[in-house]
């Protein structure tokens, strides 16, 4: 199986994820050169990485998280304090691009193509696009708007988890 990891450079101020993702993919690929058992199935982990640059987007968005935006609020992660960090429609933008890529792959190969988004519950209160309701509506719009969309699976495995849950899963996988 081949996994394509995708990150987006949309002019975000916090760059560490973009800086570290390539070395993480290299680490995973070198660690899992041999097959591993996942849910009773033998899997060869091959990960390709693509960074998609959304040049110019940050200048059009009103958010403290993008270059040219206000200062990122400090202090308690309270709803009112952190609303300035909402990047309008960010997860929809990402999902639309990833859905289009997955559908293109499915059409080209004739095989099912699954996507998994890292949207997580820790952000529900502040970011409306981190909720099950949003994910379901997004999936519905994708299915209505595309022929062959049944060939694309859409997973949000951390929608009920937080960043700590993601970290724990990563640690468990690295131990295996």
Predicted segments with their positions:
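Nucleotide-activated chemistry modules centered on ATP-dependent adenylation/adenylyltransferase
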Residues: 1-176
